[in-house]
A protein has these predicted regions:
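PRPP-associated nucleotide enzymes
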Residues: 1-165
Length: 165
């Protein structure tokens, strides 16, 4: 895409992170009545997952990539039949979220939904079938490699947290 959204800078200010997460928590409470566990993908989801977990008084764990694949480490686990909410900082294609879904299914737990500070997905690019609760919805077009506009082709992809084309 022609735009990059970085939540790490916002989340580096504890009071701002707390304020954003309180507001998002209220939306989450309205949408999801029963949450047993919050799962956040590293790196971007760790701070928001922790803040939301603190506010909602829910256990929060994170998954991390090892050899390109999300796994649970550090003694984290997902209990069978638990109701799990996936929380990210930004959702674009939903690819990271769907990788988290695999961990939930493997544990025979139940995915209840997704939440993020920024939802910049579009129906065209989204791989998620469930509704996303977000603080902000931003419409930013994304492109497949073979459909990339000429003005973007010359710009190297060097943004932290992004997946390379």
């Amino acid at each position: 895409s022609s735009k990059y959204i970085q939540c790490a800078k916002l989340l580096s200010f504890p009071k701002k992170a707390e304020k954003i997460c309180k507001s998002l928590s209220n939306k989450i409470k309205k949408k999801f009545k029963k949450i047993d566990l919050i799962l956040a993908p590293a790196m971007g989801g760790i701070i928001i997952g922790y803040e939301i977990g603190k506010i909602l008084k829910k256990e929060t764990i994170f998954c991390e990539r090892v050899n390109g694949k999300f796994i649970l480490r550090r003694g984290f686990s997902i209990k069978k039949n638990s109701r799990v909410l996936i929380i990210e900082d930004v959702i674009t294609t939903g690819k990271s979220s769907m990788e988290c879904v695999k961990l939930i299914k493997k544990a025979k737990a139940k995915l209840i939904g997704f939440a993020s500070i920024i939802d910049r997905s579009s129906k065209k690019s989204l791989k998620i079938n469930q509704k996303i609760v977000s603080q902000f919805k931003i419409n930013v077009p994304t492109y497949k490699k073979n459909k990339l506009p000429n003005y973007l082709k010359s710009i190297p992809i060097t943004i932290p947290g992004s997946r390379f084309i």
